[in-house]
Amino acid sequence: MPVRRGHVAPQNTFLDTIIRKFEGQSRKFIIANARVENCAVIYCNDGFCELCGYSRAEVMQRPCTCDFLHGPRTQRRAAAQIAQALLGAEERKVEIAFYRKDGSCFLCLVDVVPVKNEDGAVIMFILNFEVVMEKDMVGSPARDTNHRAPPTSWLAPGRAKTFRLKLPALLALTARETPVRPGGAGSAGAPGAVVVDVDLTPAAPSSESLALDEVTAMDNHVAGIGPAEERRALVGSGSPPACAPGPHPSPRAHSLNPDGSGSSCSLARTRSRESCASVRRASSADDIEAMRAGALPPPPRHASTGAMHPLRSGLLNSTSDSDLVRYRTISKIPQITLNFVDLKGDPFLASPTSDREIIAPKIKERTHNVTEKVTQVLSLGADVLPEYKLQAPRIHRWTILHYSPFKAVWDWLILLLVIYTAVFTPYSAAFLLKETEEGSQAPDCGYACQPLAVVDLIVDIMFIVDILINFRTTYVNANEEVVSHPGRIAVHYFKGWFLIDMVAAIPFDLLIFGSGSEELIGLLKTARLLRLVRVARKLDRYSEYGAAVLFLLMCTFALIAHWLACIWYAIGNMEQPNMDSHIGWLHNLGDQIGKPYNSSGLGGPSIKDKYVTALYFTFSSLTSVGFGNVSPNTNSEKIFSICVMLIGSLMYASIFGNVSAIIQRLYSGTARYHTQMLRVREFIRFHQIPNPLRQRLEEYFQHAWSYTNGIDMNAVLKGFPECLQADICLHLNRSLLQHCKPFRGATKGCLRALAMKFKTTHAPPGDTLVHAGDLLTALYFISRGSIEILRGDVVVAILGKNDIFGEPLNLYARPGKSNGDVRALTYCDLHKIHRDDLLEVLDMYPEFSDHFWSSLEITFNLRDTNMIPGSPGSTELEGGFNRQRKRKLSFRRRTDKDPEQPGEVSALGPSRAGAGPSGRGQQGGPWGESLSSGPSSPESSEDEGPGRSSSPLRLVPFSSPRPPGELPGGDPLTEDVEKSSDTCNPLSGAFSGVSNIFSFWGDSRGRQYQELPRCPAPAPAPSLLNIPLSSPGRRPRGDVESRLDALQRQLNRLETRLSADMATVLQLLQRQMTLVPPAYSAVTTPGPGPASTSPLLPVSPIPTLTLDSLSQVSQFMACEELPQDGPARRLSLPGQLGALTSQPLHRHGSDPGS
């Protein structure tokens, strides 16, 4: 498995740090954005919500001035101070009365703290709220707790004065550190004094003065009082303030800026810009004298004042971590009492300058006062307020990242040392202790004088250094966070591998040197093998590689055989001196190689012979291949051999059993290829595909496999979350979206949506992408390679990189058909997007749609207009495309609000009076709204109202008969439908040719259902049904089908009723007709028949019946017949009809209008 690096991506820990520090202190705070209007609140904690009684949803996006907490007892000057602090990005404490949601009042101390980014710009504010006391427990405050300067309007114009101001509230707050007598006066050099010189004589502003806006009421502006509209405008303004509203800050917000920017002291404003004073800062009285002199250099400063002066500008108002770390040794700022004192009035009054000087006491730690103040106010301790930016995890000094290159190299070095320890420690303990030849070479030198002892000493030193490094190495906790705190690292290491590493690093040979216990030293040194556990854990990350796993298994097998060989020799060496029969394996080995042991136990084989023979025996036993030349003879040797066989069986099953799986994994790709190729060939054989197509299939499969290695890229992509899929698709299509002109200027969201719809296609040479006659359902963009377009055997175009081919997309027309074959000449990479997906994205981003259609230039139009009868040409599609697209967009934006219930039949909407200039739509009575079966004039369609298309369809009764010579008028379709009659709208001719079904004879019934044309005829489509038609993409298909079914059922009912009515009419006509005898007959006309045969209903004359009644019956359907070349057929009864009575014909009982 790979190394767990943890969450190492840069994170913005600003909010997490604030919440973590404040949760344990019961703080109540809000965070506001300084870069939006009114400094809107972007976060508030639960403590603030409990304090004010509002929920987080009610507080979010409110102005951070908290005007929603104001009430009758809220001080206006305090609210103005908060607004000025926000506007000037100043740190300030303000005591103000707020009201909860339930109306209760409380006195609150508000800390305003600006937050800066890495560039030093204020981007946020933190407002901390601390409840002083409930308002009902105290009366109205009699003290000015916000330390505002009183109005100075009482000063005479042109006279400069100095004055002393007692600040009881300030003295009370700072009495713990610097108590001041109420009437005491300080001096210029007193540490707790601030000297203020006021000169209100009009003078031109100097170059160092701060420009102040003109004001209308000096009293209000000096006191910070103004209308609520002015205060809101002050907060909403984007310009920084000219000066602060108060004479000086609160006791803990007393920092003075040397350059005069961001001052926290308040200045009184004059009535005009010319008389406004400027602010400059000094640390002592001699600085003021230098400023007065102008060109004179300042006298030498005290070391405590001037030492840190070059660093002030960089640290003022700083809240970053780096600034505090550099100056962490500076002590905290003491609480300072600021007093206005009368000091040397005559020289200052005689001074011609109009500057107002503010003298601060000499404090050597003033350089980082703002940061310290933030730390003190927010109680952040060592982890100060972070900058609002993406910050990498904080790494303490001398801390090593666990994934750093140095740690990786060090781990490999320790790995090699551990392998050395695993090999030579058992060998030294078994073969090199108490060897007679070693003792004879150096009788007076111990085991430590051996060459391997120096290497062992170096290994021990490296292990000790590794323990120290582990105490400073980061780790990943359960939350996938990188822990770099030294204390937490030490605790984690103590709970983990410290004990094992410590035992493995103890130099036992040095501790027990000279004691004569060499055997004990050798056994204790085997404790170094405990480090192999950590090595096994580190090597686990390579388990995903088959070759590495195979190599590690073989090394493990050899290492175990080495250890068992050392144990096998130790057993024989231990039994050899005490054995009388000389049957051990060492004696047999000596006899076999001609180096037997003598009677004193000396002689015998060499160490090399012993080790090789022991290793040979353990390997043959582990692999269950024993030749018998080295055999166990004693009981100890036999018991050990049994153990070796058991271990060997386990090793054989675990190691060599995995070899086949490892080899199979190495050839898994080849096996998958052959399996898939076998499926392709079986598919070819089963379907008997001819040889040319078979060859193309096999070539494409081989090329696709070599290109993708048999990996389904789409399946891999779908395994990631959608947001990551969009980023991946944006990267895959980056060259197309960046260099293709139609996609320039699109928003990031639009590009991500388009990238998700694009599909990448790879085509080898000779592959046919589009055949002649195929539907053009996609638009293709070539990113690499070249293609050719053929018509028959003729090459009509060759396209290359950055070319586009397809058809101009028409929102209404059906997809066109290709007029040629598209074949790849080289290896090509193409990006294609389906027309439906493209139209969907453009519909979601209408602002980008106009730019796309105007910039899209198709290199070659594949649409074949000859294959689609009646379809417009390419020039018509390109020329009228924008008009059609806008028409569709306006058509889609309509809201269909038909409250239509299932099973109801839509009714015809009411007709307008005066549908056309001829007045055909003007009819009287309730029947005047019926629709005509004849074609309506184009003029009538032009007067269509905007709301006509959405009017409900309702059934109306017959109207009174029209004059015989007038054709019945009708209502046209909606204006949008008529205007779209020149396009290939599939619904444009849905009701054409329906009016002929009301003809009485069979020739008309044959034309009842006509095939809808692909494109309507040039003549304007007649309007018979006032049904609101919408785009197929917006109106459900089932809605249209249900309306057509209802219409068909209505037609059938009307046809049945019409046939019955006509039969009744004919019977009545036969009864009422006068029998006229022939001229040659003498028969006279008979009189009236009996009463039983007299007609119940008188009838109207035949002409009236023909022109009016039949047309009224036909008006049940709001349909018109298709435009025809010949004149319109007029409905008439067959045969020659005589005169009838003048009585009107009554309607049948089954008539809907009865």
From Swiss-Prot:
Residues 928-939 have a biased composition (Low complexity). Residues 425-450, 517-520, 569-611, 633-638 are extracellular. Phosphorylated on serine and threonine residues. Phosphorylation by PKA inhibits ion conduction. Residues 41-70 form the PAS domain. It catalyses: K(+)(in) = K(+)(out). Residues 883-892 have a biased composition (Basic residues). The modification Phosphoserine is found at residues 239, 283-284, 320, 351, 871, 874, 1132. It is found in: Cell membrane. Residues 258-269 have a biased composition (Polar residues). GO terms for biological process: cellular response to xenobiotic stimulus; membrane depolarization during action potential; negative regulation of potassium ion export across plasma membrane; positive regulation of DNA-templated transcription; positive regulation of potassium ion transmembrane transport; potassium ion export across plasma membrane; potassium ion homeostasis; potassium ion import across plasma membrane. PANTHER family: POTASSIUM VOLTAGE-GATED CHANNEL SUBFAMILY H MEMBER 2, VOLTAGE AND LIGAND GATED POTASSIUM CHANNEL. The S4-S5 linker acts as a signal integrator where it both couples voltage-sensor domain (VSD) movement to pore opening and closure, as well as providing a binding site for other domains that regulate activation and/or deactivation of the channel. This is Voltage-gated inwardly rectifying potassium channel KCNH2. It comes from Sus scrofa (Pig). The gene is KCNH2.
